[in-house]
Amino acid sequence: MIYLLLGGICACFGTANALGASTLLRPLLDAVAPLDPSAIAMLSTAAALCAALVSAFFALSRPLAIHQDELLFLAIGALGDLVAARFIAMLSPGSAKLLGNALLFTVLALPKVYFSALAHSIRPLSITRMASLPTSVLLGLVASFLSFGAIPLTLMAYDYLFNAQQEESSTAALAVSLCAMAGKLIVMLIRLRLNLPSADILLWLLPGMLLGTAAGIIPGVQRSIGRTGETALGLSLFTTLINMAAALA
């Protein structure tokens, strides 16, 4: 039952950002279930697909005002789970464990990240690290409207504007991704409220597809990054590919 509950919660995130729920469900299952990675991967995919099917049945019976484009995002999110399971399986065990711990740490300790670990001045702008919180929210909302992963945008912003260290930028990028998920949910509610046509959705998807790809490549070309940065960059590029599929569908 806990897997189905977690799958339902993660399916909501998958609907909001057109990304499969495995990236969020996997560290949660790893924390509560003493199972091997292959079993956790299978449970993650099964729970997310079950939650997607249940959500689809609810949408077809129309108790909620969900349009066809939202059902498309839900289906892409479910398929993204299958791809995400293979994507994480391609990583080394250390990288996968590092990614899972970073995601779980971000979900459970977001205030601590900003108010203690990042509480020092920023150069060359000489702004206190407290200013990174509204900056992260703004970056997350911009990334939501552009419909691409917030990780590459945050890596560039913290690198070029704040002169932050790579580990610091990667941690902030994972935190901003949560802001992007919330922002995408807000965008979805705005679209439902204003009854925006599909053309407006593509208007936000296509620029995000191009900018997300460019932003994800620049940090890797600019400097050599550590294992954490490589994992975050790979996750952001995977998000961009999923959004490209959503734009072309």
Where are these regions (language model features)?
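Short hydrophobic/aromatic, small-residue-rich stretches within specific transmembrane helices
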Residues: 44-48, 173-177, 201-206
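Hydrophobic alpha-helical transmembrane segments of multi-pass integral membrane proteins
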Residues: 169-187
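Juxtamembrane transmembrane-helix boundary motif
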Residues: 1-20, 24-38, 57-146, 153-160, ...
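A general structural signal for well-ordered alpha-helical packing
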Residues: 154-158, 166, 175, 179
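Transmembrane alpha-helices of multi-pass small-molecule transport proteins
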Residues: 43-58
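Hydrophobic transmembrane alpha-helical segments of multi-pass transport and channel proteins
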Residues: 53, 178-182, 210, 214
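Membrane-interface alpha-helices at helix entry/exit sites of multi-pass transporters
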Residues: 35-44, 67-72, 163-175
